[in-house]
């Protein structure tokens, strides 16, 4: 089995509103990495992709691949856990050639079960930075988990030098919203803090964040942004692309209007970065 991990990320405020030309170039770049995987499979007439993603852009990439190679792409879509369960249960009889999902946390868990094989090639090493790949999987896009704030209630001075660690600062008491800790995005964020600060420090940090919550954790990432827009909180943690989705109007006028009331902030710019 081969594995591709998909990540989505924007590294600055300006990148949230990419133009069509840059978007097309990004898709072409992603296609190039996917082709690297596909062409390393046996010279088969078709390839089976098990994907936990649900974006039309992926389908367009598969179509381009088929046009380029003549190899048919069969896509099996589903929730991440359901796909993993199926692959495990089918064992050696699984038809999965490539597994696509989001977040390294999910990949680490699945890889620990021995479900992947070495998929590294010189082409992947040349195209993907070392910190975005492992022996058994590679990232082909990235995303950031950032903060969103109300410009009406949060001052520039408060955000000066703001870090993820700063979410535990008592000055944010009753002002922070973030989804539940069982969410994989939050688990990966916590894992990065453990890596950089150690388990003991991160444990104390988590207690501080809970103490600063404006309300009990509930809802998805967009719900956190909506809470800030509604005045229920001043600071939210969510992935970058959700703001872009809301601003696009695809989720309705209410969410579009709410997205215009918040601003994104990229923490830890003074040290390891977002």
What is the predicted function of each stretch?
Residues 73-75, 176, 262-264:
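Generic structural signal for residues in well-ordered beta-strands
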Residues 52, 56-59, 95-232, 243-249:
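Extracytoplasmic ligand-binding site segments that recognize negatively charged/polar headgroups
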Residues 219, 223-226, 230, 238, ...:
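Extracytoplasmic/periplasmic substrate-recognition and gating elements
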Residues 44-109:
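Early extracytoplasmic/lumenal segment of secretory-pathway proteins
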Residues 6-24:
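Short, Lys/Arg-enriched N-terminal segments with co-localized hydrophobic residues
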Residues 31-40:
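Bacterial N-terminal signal peptides
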Residues 48, 146-148, 263:
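Residues embedded in well-ordered beta-strands
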């Amino acid at each position: 089995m081969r594995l591709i991990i998909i990540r989505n990320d924007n590294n600055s405020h300006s990148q949230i509103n990419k133009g069509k030309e840059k978007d097309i170039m990004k898709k072409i770049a992603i296609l190039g990495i996917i082709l690297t995987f596909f062409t390393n499979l046996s010279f088969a007439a078709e390839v089976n992709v098990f994907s936990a993603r649900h974006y039309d852009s992926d389908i367009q990439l598969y179509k381009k691949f088929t046009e380029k190679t003549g190899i048919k792409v069969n896509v099996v879509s589903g929730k991440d856990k359901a796909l993993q369960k199926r692959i495990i249960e089918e064992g050696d009889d699984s038809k999965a050639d490539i597994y696509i999902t989001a977040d390294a946390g999910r990949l680490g868990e699945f890889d620990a079960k021995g479900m992947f094989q070495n998929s590294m090639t010189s082409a992947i090493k040349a195209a993907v930075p070392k910190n975005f790949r492992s022996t058994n999987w590679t990232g082909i896009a990235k995303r950031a988990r950032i903060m969103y704030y109300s410009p009406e209630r949060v001052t520039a001075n408060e955000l000066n030098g703001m870090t993820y660690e700063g979410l535990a600062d008592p000055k944010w008491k009753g002002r922070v919203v973030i989804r539940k800790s069982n969410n994989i995005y939050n688990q990966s964020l916590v894992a990065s803090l453990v890596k950089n600060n150690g388990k003991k420090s991160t444990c104390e940090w988590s207690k501080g964040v809970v103490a600063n919550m404006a309300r009990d954790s509930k809802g998805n990432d967009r719900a956190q942004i909506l809470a800030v827009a509604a005045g229920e909180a001043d600071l939210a943690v969510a992935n970058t692309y959700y703001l872009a989705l809301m601003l696009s109007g695809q989720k309705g006028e209410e969410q579009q209007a709410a997205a215009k009331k918040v601003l994104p902030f990229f923490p830890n710019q003074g040290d390891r970065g977002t």
